[in-house]
Amino acid sequence: MLFESIYIQCLNKFSKYKKFVCHTTCNCPNYKIIGYLLYFLCLCRPINCSLPLSRHDLAFGSFSYYLTMFLYRILVRLLQFYYFVKFSAILFLGFAVKGRSLFEKKQREKPNVLEGWDSRYIKLKKVRLHYVQTGSDDKPLMLFIHGYPEFWYSWRFQLKEFADKYRCVAIDQRGYNLSDKPKHVDNYSIDELTGDIRDVIEGLGYDKAIVVAHDWGGLVAWQFAEQYPEMVDKLICCNIPRPGSFRKRIYTSWSQFRKSWYMFFYQNEKIPEMLCSADDMKMLELCFRAKEIGIQNNKNFTDEDLEAWKYSFSMNGASFKYPINYYRNIFNAKKQQADLVLEMPTLIIWGTADGALDIEAAVDSLNTLKQGTMKKIEGASHWVQQDEPEMVNEHIKKFLNKYQ
């Protein structure tokens, strides 16, 4: 009953979390224990502290800090185990129905849509990255960073559009497509990823770049802008908030917490890779074509585009293991400078039909941008630069012209 008593005390003491956790525990019985743990986290921190949690936020001394971190780890482990059981059962049932064909790897030929591009490599300090370029080498650098589960081709509409004025470079991040794939999980930490961006810009002969990013590429771009602001001429992030704003949202919003289920699932070993690869990489089709979360304009994601994705995840030693390792580092990442104001001109483009991220985190991001602008694209999905390329390109053009 002590557990119940603490839970009730938390309900009374932390009213701003009441609606969130009551909804969690009452309407979603499977998450009752998660609701309890969330309230333990609330109990260990002052009402008006900033998020994410830090030593400076905690009003009750080091014991409260360590208790909070201990309970947080329990929460992550519980969710990790819950999704391990859930998706292991799904894979078992799938295997019972389809047998070995569920995990059969198909031989694929390179799709025509990947032909005719200027494909290059750059050797960095630790890895060799692949990139595709449009525009000439003597123009200002516009660097494109893709998200998950993507590769350079997700910027195909932008590579063509901006080639007349810029040297457009779309990289395959480490672990993707034709780039190197280090084996260890630690090789995919945020510090390693931001180091790659620094090395790419310098390796191409520049001291700064216009950085355009989406999803996980955006997380890398935000962190890069914090660590190396002098190397970011302008920053454009598509459907990705600042990490500090995202953490605020996931701690205080059941909507975002629920949408982020896969982050906990990806903490497991092997099962996520097996699920993503199963049934001829059905997961990719769901990501980009499902009504709720996929690209809304079907003409912008053809059957051949889908085949290009499957090709990139099946050739050259590619595996879902390496991109998923990004997520396996996410709970160990150092705390971002949530209150650091970024000085460079920054544009956030947001598709309002994003099934993975709440727009409120993007709006909150503007509070820490000195020259921040946000443009909403109504009805566009999380994959906004592919869903509405004409509108995205127009917003980027106006933004670049404004800050010439």
Curated annotation (Swiss-Prot):
Disruption phenotype: RNAi knockdown of both ceeh-1 and ceeh-2 results in the accumulation of 9,10-EpOME and 12,13-EpOME.
Topology of this chain in the membrane: Single-pass membrane protein
Compartments (UniProt record): Membrane
AB hydrolase-1 domain segment(s): 140-389
Alphabetized GO MF terms: epoxide hydrolase activity; hydrolase activity
Catalyzed chemical reaction(s): an epoxide + H2O = an ethanediol; 8,9-epoxy-(5Z,11Z,14Z)-eicosatrienoate + H2O = 8,9-dihydroxy-(5Z,11Z,14Z)-eicosatrienoate; 11,12-epoxy-(5Z,8Z,14Z)-eicosatrienoate + H2O = 11,12-dihydroxy-(5Z,8Z,14Z)-eicosatrienoate; 14,15-epoxy-(5Z,8Z,11Z)-eicosatrienoate + H2O = 14,15-dihydroxy-(5Z,8Z,11Z)-eicosatrienoate
Keyword check for Aminoacyl-tRNA synthetase: no
EC number(s) on file: 3.3.2.10
A Gene Ontology cellular-component term: membrane
Record-stated family: Belongs to the AB hydrolase superfamily. Epoxide hydrolase family.
Function: Catalyzes the hydrolysis of epoxide-containing fatty acids. Active against epoxyeicosatrienoic acids (EETs) including 8,9-epoxy-(5Z,11Z,14Z)-eicosatrienoate (8,9-EET), 11,12-epoxy-(5Z,8Z,14Z)-eicosatrienoate (11,12-EET) and 14,15-epoxy-(5Z,8Z,11Z)-eicosatrienoate (14,15-EET) and the linoleic acid metabolites 12,13-epoxy-(9Z)-octadecenoate (12,13-EpOME) and 9,10-epoxy-(12Z)-octadecenoate (9,10-EpOME).
Protein name, as recorded: Epoxide hydrolase 1
Gene: ceeh-1
